[in-house]
């Protein structure tokens, strides 16, 4: 109430001592900077700074459909809660979102299961690669978190229990949060992934042996490969994560997707687990909850303000977009805002 009342007054109306003057500066100087931010100029400058980094990473080569992508593509898009959409570079080019889809399926399952989901998957960083089998045996088939492949398979398995037509439900959800009915599954990518899904098949069967997978493993892998193949642009992705920046409310239609509490917890998981064994480094360098995919996409949010999506197919040694990480580090540095 204090801030709302103060905003309506002229600063000259206040008779305040030097301590109050300093307090005024602390409260309103950052707000003024935020409201006046020219995001288009910011990302254009970052784009030009980062573009020379082409060639420092490599495309995902274990999925043929991804290995054949032109690596020299790079786009950035920002969507704000006050309705701004800005982009630069290849921000309107579609690409498969891969593991970014795990955020959508997690939101769908948490929406219906709530805390019951955590009986089947943990909430701790793994510190291991995204497709690792190592911890599962020690932890009795319970994956560390929902963003490594094993955890995402558990989430998709529960989603299959909730929806009679899970693939249709996932696509409908993504279209709704992105405000775009033209989003689709890339069947070529999905088929390519299914044909090279030996590790995910192993994860599924191993967890099923512990009783932590309910559905047929082949059917589970089919749904999972399709969700990873969803084709979106940077603009689509930025818009689709606004419901998390908006504390669980889809700003495109005012639908309540998650409670405020669940939205915060999902964002917390993105911060601690969203970048596999680089999650701590990302939090240290960037300071935003986010999620990456081996298709080269990265998306992150500043709660209450905006979401930003970056795409460049060349990956670093952790399987995250090399230029995407560089872009987001520069973004929070340049605007002077993160969650910390």
What are these regions (language model features)?
Residues 164, 194, 201, 205-265, ...:
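Penicillin-binding protein/beta-lactamase superfamily catalytic region
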Residues 103, 107, 231-249, 302-313:
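Active-site-proximal alpha-helical segments within enzyme catalytic domains
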Residues 82-83, 96-118, 240, 308:
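Active-site SXXK
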Residues 72-74, 87-108, 120-123, 143:
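Short active-site loop at a secondary-structure junction
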Residues 15-18, 22-36:
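Short, Lys/Arg-enriched N-terminal segments with co-localized hydrophobic residues
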Residues 247-340:
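Structured C-terminal helix/loop/strand segments within mature extracytoplasmic catalytic/sensor domains
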Residues 38-50, 54-55, 111-227:
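Active-site-adjacent helix/loop patches that line small-molecule binding or acyl-intermediate pockets
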Residues 51-88, 299-300:
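A short, well-structured edge-of-sheet supersecondary motif
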């Amino acid at each position: 109430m204090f801030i709302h009342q103060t905003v309506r007054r002229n600063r000259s109306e206040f008779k305040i001592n030097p301590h109050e003057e300093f307090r005024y500066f602390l409260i309103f100087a950052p707000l003024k900077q935020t409201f006046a931010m020219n995001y288009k100029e910011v990302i254009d400058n970052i784009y030009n700074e980062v573009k020379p980094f082409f060639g420092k990473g490599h495309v995902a080569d274990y999925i043929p459909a991804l290995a054949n992508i032109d690596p020299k593509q790079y786009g950035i898009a920002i969507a704000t809660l006050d309705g701004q959409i800005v982009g630069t570079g290849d921000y309107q080019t579609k690409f498969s979102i891969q593991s970014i889809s795990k955020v959508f399926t997690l939101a769908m399952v948490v929406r219906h299961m709530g805390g019951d989901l955590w009986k089947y998957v943990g909430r701790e960083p793994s510190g291991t690669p995204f497709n690792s089998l190592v911890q599962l045996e020690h932890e009795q088939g319970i994956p560390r978190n929902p963003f490594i492949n094993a955890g995402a398979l558990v989430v998709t398995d529960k989603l299959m229990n909730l929806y009679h037509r899970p693939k249709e439900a996932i696509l409908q959800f993504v279209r709704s949060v992105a405000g775009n009915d033209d989003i689709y599954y890339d069947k070529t990518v999905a088929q390519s992934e299914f044909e090279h899904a030996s590790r995910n098949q192993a994860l599924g069967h191993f967890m099923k042996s512990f009783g932590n997978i309910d559905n047929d493993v082949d059917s589970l892998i089919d749904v999972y490969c399709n969700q990873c193949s969803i084709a979106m642009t940077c603009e689509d992705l930025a818009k689709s994560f606004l419901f998390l920046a908006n504390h669980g409310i889809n700003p495109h239609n005012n639908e309540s997707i998650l409670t405020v509490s669940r939205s915060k917890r999902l964002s917390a998981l993105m911060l601690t687990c969203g970048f596999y064994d680089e999650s701590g480094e990302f939090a240290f360098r960037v300071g935003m909850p986010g999620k990456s995919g081996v298709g080269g996409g990265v998306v992150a949010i500043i709660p209450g303000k905006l979401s930003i999506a970056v795409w460049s197919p060349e990956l670093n040694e952790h399987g995250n977009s090399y230029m995407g990480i560089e872009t987001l580090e520069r973004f929070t540095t340049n605007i002077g805002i993160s969650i910390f």
